[in-house]
Amino acid sequence: MRPISDQTILVTGSTDGLGRRVAAELAARGARVLVHGRDAEKVEQTVRETGAERGLVADLSSLADVRRLAGQIDLLDTLVNNAGVIVPQRSESADGHELTFAVNHLSHFLLTSLLLDRLREPARIVNVASIGQAPLNFDDLMLERGYQAYPAYAQSKLAQVLFSNELAERLRGRDVTVNALHPATMMDTKMVREQLGRPRSSVEEGVAATLRAIADPQLDGVSGRFFDGTRDAAADPQAYDADARRRLWDESERLAGIA
């Protein structure tokens, strides 16, 4: 892989929490960092305070915004799909999709698909997932027959792992790796404090694990893995079900309008 100082790196959801800290550390190491958020003022502030090269504004609950975001990027070495939400009550995106699934999985599926041809090999795609995972119910992906906030979050995060594993298979032959990770358990972030309760780990732990996935030379050529922090780990069994992975891929293409 290229040195960090010779890379352009996009970190989604990087105006707060883990994403902001990762972006700041990458910028400190000399990377050309593209920070992203949905609030223009917070994006501008993050650029100033982290030394990022550019700020990009997009609401990931809107597929049109995701397309506009991708259209602003010419070349990329590393894509970090970090943005995520926990939604207390069932809500729908601008496109009519269940909001947690739309932001945590579908937006990143579309963004990654649109940026694949703009990745400068060797390249890395890092999907920030979670050890909290729930199997996908393909008969009710939009959770119309019952909604609970944490199971919805856990399903969306497992979707990211299925997506990672399937994309890793589809990119065989290209020098592009795709891995997913659980950065740390209940980090001390605003989202955790407001939605899940008392934090159990520091943001610094999550930053270290995420930076390893982004920059560790020992992971050159390593693809289709799930990491719990810095350790290899097993995801939910559904992540290794080829039929489930393909079914999610096909459904994601349909929902994102790229089928």
Name each model-derived stretch.
Residues T50-A64:
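Rossmann-fold cofactor-recognition segment
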Residues G13-S14, H36-E41, L60:
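N-terminal Rossmann-fold cofactor-binding loop
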Residues G84-E92, H97-E98, E121-D175, H182-G197:
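Catalytic loop of short-chain dehydrogenase/reductase
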Residues R198-D236, Y240-R246, D250, R254:
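C-terminal helical subdomain
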Residues T8-V11, L76-V80, I125:
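Conserved hydrophobic beta-strands of the Rossmann-like cofactor-binding core
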Residues L60-L75:
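Conserved Rossmann-fold cofactor-binding substructure of NAD(P)-dependent oxidoreductases
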Residues R2-V35:
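Canonical Rossmann dinucleotide-binding motif of NAD(H)/NADP(H)-dependent dehydrogenases/reductases
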